[in-house]
Structures are given as structure tokens and as C-alpha cells.
């Protein structure tokens, strides 16, 4: 079993694929999963899940060997492709004409997708973006160990795209013994900033790790978000206490289960702590506000290998004249300005400027510019 210090490394760019005839086409999700499997981001996983581990993860949030793992990492193929494959074969993994890796097939099986939806996403509603994607992807899963034979070249954020081994090195170089990870797919607003800085009071460093893989269409584009993080860190954070690097995974929107997954992955990137806020990785009204925090009570910190830090929903209080939460502020709802990424997106899309209690002016400027560009290109 992988401990905090053991990273899986499945990269071999000298691996000869010239004699391998069969291939499996990877969609964008499988491609980003391939990279994270190979770089150790998904340690202790060494490949796409076979049937036993898949069933175990879906039903118990653990691999067969007992390690905590909450999201099934699968390689879907069509029935037609599946018929041409058999266990024991080595097959190329291809995307847009490039061979990125190989899989040693151990298993080919048909999952019960309804069960996967119900247990992983807690709903079979196809309006849920994670469920919709699950049902859209092909119906047969191929399990087996992988090797990454080619790194991605067209990386949109090369200077921020670091492997777990590199972020660990960076934290060590900075002398950080304790590092808190923060997952985001939104621009950082004052509520996030308040939470991050509260956590920074008790640890050595903050690892801001925005997700830049596939997200839903109304999420703010990754390049705009990255620029918003840069201006925020430049103007409002101590440079020697925070490190920005991207998380190239796809967003699953699996709420509580994804919160566990996000914590485990950040442990692999070198974090000792992980921030879990309200409705972490949630979407719509599918999950309770603090369900993503409650799920952590099923596991010990020892078996997770990372300490979750739970935060209440924070807001700007007009009476306190400061950011606060119900833990620190005695005033009523009428004095609270509730901040949410969704609300900020709404204001921006309607051409309104969010107040400074919502977002730093430098961030707002970047977002307005970015959304104007988006409108022009649509």
C-alpha cells in the first residue's frame, strides 16, 4: 500500500510501442486520468480499475486491499472495441492520432452504470453533469496496469503543470513541513480567500491547486481563472507562503466522494492538510451543504494520510465589517452578504460588477475581460 512518501511512477518514454497493433481511443477524461495514474497523482493506483477493485470502490470506497479510494477510475470502450480485445493483451492508448501509453489488459467487463451513478453520485438524474457524462461514455470497461509512453505537449499552462514529485520537491525546497491543499474550479472570491488565509495561520504553506481538466460548459474557462489566481496572489498573498500549480483532472461533480478523492490526490502532491468547505465538488442541490465534510467521519486520518480542515460557509458581515462565519459572527442573516462562485458568475454574465465585498477588484477586472472575450468568440 502506498504511504505518503511512496509515489507510483509509470512513465517510460523509451517504451517501444511499434510492435503493438491494437489500440484504444481515449476521451479527454481517460487521457487526463492516464497522466495522473502515471505521475503518481492517483497513487496507489497503477492502472484503470479491474472489476474487483471497481466493485469494491463503488460499494465500499476502498480498493480490494483496503486502501481508501472513492472514485472509480475507469477506461470505457464500445462493445465493438471490446469484442476485439482480450485479457493478457498489451494495447496502445491513443488520443487525436498520438500514442500516449499502453495498457496490459487484465479485465474486460460491463459495469452496472445505474448502480455506479446511484452510489458514486447519489442520483441517476441525467441532469447531473457527472451522471450525464457517465451515461454518455461507452458501456464496457477495460481494466489493467498502464505505462505512459509520451508526455502531453500542448499543455496550456506549462509553467504551472507540475507532477506530484515536483510539487513535493518544491515544498521541501521552501522548508514547508505542513502544507494545506485547496481545490477550486472557480475564481477565488473573498470567501475562499478568508478560508485559505485562516488555514495559512496554522500551516507553513498553501497549495492552490485549481482543476483545469474537463468541467461543465458554464464554468469560467481555465485560462481566465488562472489569470485571476495570478493577480490575486500577486496583490494579496505573501509570495513565500503560497504555491500555485494546476490539477489536470476532469471534474466529476460527485460531491462527498469527490471530496475524499481530492484529499487523497493532494496527499500525493505532498499536502499534509486539505480544505473542505461547504458543498465541496457539489452541483445543484444534489448534496447537503456539509455532506462532503461528514463523509470523512468514515475514515481515520491515518488511513487517509492527510488531515481534512473543515470550514463553515463564510460571508461578509456588514455589522462586523469583516469576513466571518457563523462560528465567529453573532449577527443575523440580514447583515450577511453571501458570496458564491455561482453568484459572481451570474453578476458578470449580466454585465454587473461584483462589489469589493465579493471579489478583489483586480480579479473582477480579469473576469470581465475574460468573459467579454468569451462572448466575442461564441
Curated annotation (Swiss-Prot):
GO molecular function terms noted in the UniProt entry: ATP binding; sulfate adenylyltransferase (ATP) activity
Catalysis performed (reactions): sulfate + ATP + H(+) = adenosine 5'-phosphosulfate + diphosphate
GO biological process: hydrogen sulfide biosynthetic process; sulfate assimilation
Pfam hit, one: PUA_2
CDD domains assigned: ATPS (cd00517)
EC number: 2.7.7.4
Keywords for the protein's UniProt record, in alphabetical order: ATP-binding, Nucleotide-binding, Nucleotidyltransferase, Transferase
Family of this protein: Belongs to the sulfate adenylyltransferase family.
The protein's name in its UniProt record: Sulfate adenylyltransferase
Organism: Bacillus thuringiensis (strain Al Hakam)
Name of the encoding gene: sat
Amino acid at each position: 500500500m502506498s504511504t505518503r512518501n511512496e509515489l507510483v511512477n509509470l512513465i517510460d518514454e523509451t517504451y517501444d510501442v511499434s510492435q503493438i497493433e491494437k489500440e484504444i481511443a481515449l476521451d479527454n477524461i481517460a487521457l487526463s486520468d492516464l497522466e495522473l495514474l502515471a505521475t503518481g497523482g492517483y497513487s496507489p493506483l497503477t492502472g484503470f480499475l479491474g472489476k474487483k477493485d471497481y466493485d469494491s470502490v463503488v460499494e465500499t470506497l476502498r480498493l480490494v486491499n483496503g486502501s481508501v479510494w472513492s472514485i472509480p477510475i475507469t477506461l470505457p470502450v464500445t462493445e465493438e472495441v471490446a469484442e476485439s480485445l482480450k485479457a493478457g493483451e498489451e494495447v496502445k492508448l491513443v488520443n487525436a492520432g498520438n500514442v500516449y501509453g499502453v495498457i496490459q489488459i487484465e479485465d474486460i467487463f460491463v459495469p452496472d452504470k445505474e448502480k455506479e451513478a446511484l452510489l458514486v453520485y447519489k442520483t441517476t438524474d441525467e441532469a447531473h453533469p457527472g451522471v450525464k457524462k457517465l451515461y454518455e461514455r461507452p458501456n464496457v470497461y477495460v481494466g489493467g496496469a498502464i505505462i505512459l509512453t509520451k508526455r502531453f505537449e500542448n499543455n496550456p499552462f506549462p509553467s504551472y503543470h507540475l507532477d506530484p514529485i515536483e510539487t513535493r520537491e518544491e515544498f521541501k525546497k521552501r522548508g514547508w513541513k505542513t502544507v494545506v491543499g485547496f481545490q477550486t474550479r472557480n475564481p477565488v472570491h473573498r470567501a475562499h480567500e478568508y478560508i485559505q488565509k485562516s488555514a495559512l495561520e496554522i500551516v507553513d504553506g498553501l497549495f492552490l491547486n485549481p482543476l483545469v481538466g474537463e468541467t461543465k460548459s458554464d464554468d469560467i474557462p481555465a485560462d481566465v481563472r488562472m489569470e485571476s489566481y495570478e493577480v490575486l496572489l500577486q496583490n494579496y498573498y505573501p509570495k513565500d507562503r503560497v504555491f500555485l500549480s494546476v490539477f489536470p483532472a476532469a471534474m466529476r461533480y460527485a460531491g462527498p466522494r469527490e471530496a475524499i478523492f481530492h484529499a487523497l490526490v493532494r496527499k500525493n502532491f505532498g499536502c499534509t492538510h486539505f480544505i473542505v468547505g461547504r458543498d465541496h465538488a457539489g452541483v445543484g442541490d444534489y448534496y447537503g451543504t456539509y455532506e462532503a465534510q461528514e463523509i470523512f467521519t468514515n475514515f481515520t486520518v491515518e488511513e487517509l494520510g492527510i488531515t481534512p480542515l473543515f470550514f463553515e460557509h463564510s460571508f461578509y458581515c456588514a455589522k462586523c465589517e469583516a469576513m466571518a462565519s457563523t462560528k465567529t459572527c453573532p449577527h443575523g442573516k440580514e447583515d450577511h452578504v453571501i458570496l458564491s462562485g455561482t453568484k459572481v458568475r451570474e453578476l458578470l454574465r449580466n454585465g454587473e460588477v461584483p462589489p469589493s465585498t465579493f471579489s478583489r477588484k483586480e480579479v473582477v477586472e480579469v473576469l470581465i475581460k475574460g468573459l467579454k472575450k468569451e462572448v466575442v468568440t461564441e
